[in-house]
């Protein structure tokens, strides 16, 4: 073998070893000829631009030669955090060439993502709001701080939102449409419902937060993974230009088969400082089989019923971080009025809304919110499911602190029934003072909790300072926080 031939073969072997690969999507519903391409970490913008030009060139050549795939090519480009990539329609020859490029980390077939909720019935009383500000099920009042999420923006990555619904009070706006159907409205109802739970005046948790509609699912409640990633990318860029990613929340009441690309995109948004609440899924199976629920850095939410049991449909397992009300949840519907839906899709916006509420109240970053909600929650959920490491049901902290902070009573709406004012709590009898023993000083008074959301004896103790001092970075805490429960 000649030396030049040997060198040529060796270089080819090195190139193949460093090239990306096409991932298998298992049982996920793939979209024919549609692919997501993720570049390797460290790829420069210049390299990315050259790669895209090269892809367009070989794609045009292959399509012209074979006469395939009209209107194909790159459809979405991703560039936020350390993630660079794109998605589009490509023939087999082109995608093989792309996967062989050493700059490519992996190529993933595009799949269909769907909503995690279903319509059950109209006009039934909602209970979720009252449950998250009470220690016990069956209460009727929702107690919350008057800050109510003010200054926080929540991105509804869903089927769209009826931004003109009166319950949003002008705080809803249209962001973008990744479906490209020319229909910038919610033709399904799912997105409007989840948005109402997050920020609605009547049905919402963060009643003063803003919501931005990011349409990634069609009127049937489904859409491509590539469009979901593009939606996350858009949210991160929009937030960075409008108030900052540290004051932004993304709710994703959707999911599909396991996707490395989608999980990677979600992780990049968290790294940017955003809080991501994600539905665990409605298949009564391990949530690790679904994306983006299987991504470690997001806050994955299971659903609970009115008796605090895990909802029968809710996914479970180590990926689940928290539970929230998800059965028979009443919220807004397109065109006005309300409707009831069930699903982890309904649980996730409770967490997204509460995340916005806590971010506004305490000024914490998005990456710290999931752990904070674990601290505030109650260990209430029965039958959390096999391998689930938590039984925590979310709580806004009011019940734990006797409602001592500035708060507003409210009752979840009931059709044709006026709101019920909050009943004042019974005053407690003061305990009899104890006489000190002879020769002993009088005991000091017990410390009184001042901050309604701090589960420690007094406000002088700062958990974040303590953690950083003795255990290192927020990254360490975020990575291993899910094992505290």
Curated annotation (Swiss-Prot):
Q: Which organism is it from?
A: Arthroderma otae (Microsporum canis)
Where exactly are the transmembrane stretches of this chain? none
Matching entries from PANTHER family are given as: ALKALINE PROTEASE 1-RELATED, PEPTIDASE S8
Name the chain's protein.
Subtilisin-like protease 1
State the UniProt keywords alphabetically.
Glycoprotein, Hydrolase, Protease, Secreted, Serine protease, Signal, Virulence, Zymogen
The Swiss-Prot or TrEMBL record describes its family as follows: Belongs to the peptidase S8 family.
What is the enzyme's main class? Answer: hydrolase
Composition-biased stretches (Polar residues): 377-394
Cellular component terms, GO, for this chain's entry? extracellular region
Q: Where is the composition biased (Pro residues)?
A: 409-418, 433-455
**Signal peptide start-end:** 1-19
Q: Which residues form the propeptide?
A: 20-116
Q: Which residues are glycosylated?
A: 251
* EC annotation from Swiss-Prot or TrEMBL: 3.4.21.-
- Name of the gene encoding the protein in the UniProt record: SUB1
- Annotated Low complexity bias: 419-428
Q: Which domain of life is it from?
A: Eukaryota
Which molecular-function annotation in GO is an example for this chain? serine-type endopeptidase activity
- Which Pfam families does the record associate with it? Inhibitor_I9, Peptidase_S8
The Peptidase S8 domain is annotated at: 126-400
Residues of the active site: 158, 190, 345
UniProt subcellular location: Secreted
Identify the Gene3D superfamilies for this entry.
Answer: Peptidase S8 propeptide/proteinase inhibitor I9, Peptidase S8/S53 domain
């Amino acid at each position: 073998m000649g030396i030049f031939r040997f060198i040529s073969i060796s270089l080819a072997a090195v190139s193949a070893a460093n090239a990306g690969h096409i991932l298998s999507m298992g049982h996920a519903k793939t979209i024919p000829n549609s692919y997501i391409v993720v570049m390797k970490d460290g790829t420069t913008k210049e390299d990315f631009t050259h790669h895209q030009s090269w892809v367009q060139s070989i794609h045009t050549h292959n399509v012209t030669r074979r006469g395939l795939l009209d209107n194909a090519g790159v459809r979405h480009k991703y560039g936020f955090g350390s993630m660079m990539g794109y998605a589009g329609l490509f023939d087999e020859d082109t995608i093989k060439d792309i996967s062989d490029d050493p700059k490519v980390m992996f190529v993933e077939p595009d799949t269909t993502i769907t909503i995690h909720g279903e319509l059950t019935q109209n006009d039934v009383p909602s209970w979720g709001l009252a449950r998250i500000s009470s220690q016990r099920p069956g209460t009727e009042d929702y107690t919350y701080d008057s800050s109510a999420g003010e200054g926080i923006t929540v991105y509804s990555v869903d089927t769209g939102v009826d931004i003109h619904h009166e319950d949003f009070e002008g705080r809803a706006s249209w962001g973008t449409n990744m479906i490209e159907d020319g229909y910038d409205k919610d033709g399904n109802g799912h997105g409007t419902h989840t948005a109402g739970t997050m920020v609605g005046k009547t049905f919402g948790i963060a009643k003063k937060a803003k919501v931005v509609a990011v349409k990634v699912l069609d009127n049937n409640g489904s859409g491509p993974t590539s469009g979901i990633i593009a939606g996350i990318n858009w949210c991160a860029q929009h937030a960075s230009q409008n108030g900052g990613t540290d004051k932004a929340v993304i709710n994703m009441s959707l999911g599909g088969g396991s996707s490395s690309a989608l999980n990677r995109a979600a992780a990049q948004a968290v790294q940017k400082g955003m809080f991501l609440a994600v539905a665990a899924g409605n298949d009564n199976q391990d949530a690790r089989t679904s994306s983006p629920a299987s991504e470690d850095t997001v806050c994955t939410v299971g659903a609970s019923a009115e008796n605090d049991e895990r909802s029968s449909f809710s996914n479970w397992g180590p990926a689940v971080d928290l539970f929230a009300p998800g059965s028979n949840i009443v919220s807004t519907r397109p065109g006005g009025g309300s409707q009831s839906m069930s699903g982890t899709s309904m649980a996730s916006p409770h967490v997204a809304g509460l995340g916005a509420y806590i971010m506004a109240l305490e000024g914490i970053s998005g990456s710290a919110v999931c752990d904070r909600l674990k601290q505030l929650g109650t260990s209430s959920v029965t039958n959390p499911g096999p391998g689930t490491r938590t039984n925590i049901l979310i709580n806004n902290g009011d019940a734990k602190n006797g409602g001592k902070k500035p708060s507003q009573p409210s009752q979840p709406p009931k059709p044709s029934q006026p709101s019920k004012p909050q009943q004042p709590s019974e005053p407690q009898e003061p305990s009899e003072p104890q006489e000190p023993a002879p020769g002993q000083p009088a005991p000091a008074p017990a410390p009184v909790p001042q901050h309604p959301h701090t589960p420690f004896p007094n406000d002088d103790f700062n958990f974040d300072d303590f953690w950083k001092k003795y255990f290192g970075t927020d990254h360490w805490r975020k990575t291993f926080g899910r094992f505290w429960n």
